[in-house]
Swiss-Prot record:
The lineage of its organism: Bacteria, Thermotogati, Thermotogota, Thermotogae, Thermotogales. NCBIfam families: MJ1477/TM1410 family putative glycoside hydrolase. This is Uncharacterized protein TM_1410. It comes from Thermotoga maritima (strain ATCC 43589 / DSM 3109 / JCM 10099 / NBRC 100826 / MSB8). It holds the Pfam family Glyco_hydro_114.
């Protein structure tokens, strides 16, 4: 029985590689400077990552999010020396109560710029990101990241502009423009010290409706979650299509697209393997660089899927067009 399962697994993976070949050919012109990427926000081990085969690694600046767990410049250099591009996760739309900047007094004496706790993510609080007090906190965070030797920053909660519009605090256009301006300020700040620093926003790609072209020209790429699947459930085609319109526009301007869907339930079932491969096929067909994360949303491990992720077998194909 186990022999039969192995044979079927090989068939499934082989079919995926065949379809991937045709996918690469059909998506000629996509800007895809990396074959793969890693997204791990807890317990990331620089030594393990350096020999993993992943080309770009989005990790937290700290092993456990705390100040005491900060990676040393020497640890980040291990990845750089191995040819891995280390990118630091930074939440610019919410304050996190386990970070070095958090003050216990804020629980009872809330600053004007600090909003409500996000019910979906306990310990995360919406912030009025256009306030100078918050910007100064973020810039101090970025100083640490730059000093550590990271090669890029991964800016989360771009979509928080929608929250403040829905709360009626400011108009949607104003909220979007303030977030765009903040990202532009961040890019200018970090690139004064490191001109080649990658700037990668995550989600909230519809903010481009309010962009005059500066944001699209400034970012290095864009990252998206849940583009094709919501955990293990496939999304409706029209829902995906509405987001892809923004991403394709960015990609055609020479910006790479990182995609992470939480499709892997951790089992070796054929259903799980087929779902992961389906996600990969859809992502690559639409110009995205995929990462199949565990469906528990924890991002607390390097999710290596034998024969699939990182997709070493796909590295032999050289038919992509780079610009």
């Amino acid at each position: 029985m186990s022999h039969l399962k192995n044979i079927l697994f090989i068939i499934i993976v082989s079919l995926f590689f065949i379809s991937s070949c045709s996918t690469v050919m059909s998506t000629e012109g996509w800007f895809m400077p990396f074959d793969n990427w890693l997204y791990q926000l807890q317990n990331a081990d620089p030594v393990e990552i350096s020999s993993s085969g992943f080309e770009i690694a989005v990790i937290d600046y700290s092993k456990d999010g705390s100040e005491s767990g900060e990676y040393s410049p020497e640890e980040i250099k291990i990845m750089v020396d191995a040819g891995v591009v280390p990118v630091a996760y930074v939440n610019i739309g919410q304050a996190e109560d386990y970070r070095f900047y958090w003050k216990e007094s804020w629980y009872t004496n809330t600053p004007e710029w600090l909003g409500e706790e996000d019910p979906a993510w306990p310990g995360n609080y919406f912030v009025k990101y256009w306030y100078n007090e918050w910007k100064e906190i973020v810039f101090s965070y970025l100083d640490r990241v730059i000093d550590q030797g990271f090669k890029g920053i991964y800016l989360d909660r771009i979509d928080s502009f929608e929250y403040w519009a829905q709360e009626g605090v400011i108009s949607r256009r104003s909220a979007a423009r303030k977030m765009i301006n903040f990202v532009l300020e961040i890019a200018e700040y970090v690139r004064e010290r490191k001109p080649d620093m990658l700037i990668i926003p995550q989600n909230g790609e519809n903010i481009l409706d309010f962009d005059d072209g500066q944001l699209a020209s400034t970012v290095s790429g864009w990252a998206v979650e849940n583009l094709f699947y919501l955990k293990t459930i496939p999304l409706e085609e029209n829902e995906t299509k509405s987001r892809l319109e923004y991403l394709i526009r960015l990609n055609r301007k020479g910006k790479f697209i990182l995609s992470v869907d939480y499709v892997d339930d951790g089992s070796d079932s054929f259903e799980n393997i087929s779902r992961i491969l389906d996600y990969y096929e859809k992502a690559k067909r639409n110009g995205c660089i995929p990462y199949a994360a565990r469906s528990d949303l924890e991002l607390d491990e390097m999710n290596v899927i034998e024969g699939i992720q990182p997709p070493e077998a796909l590295k032999d194909y050289e038919s992509r067009t780079y610009r």
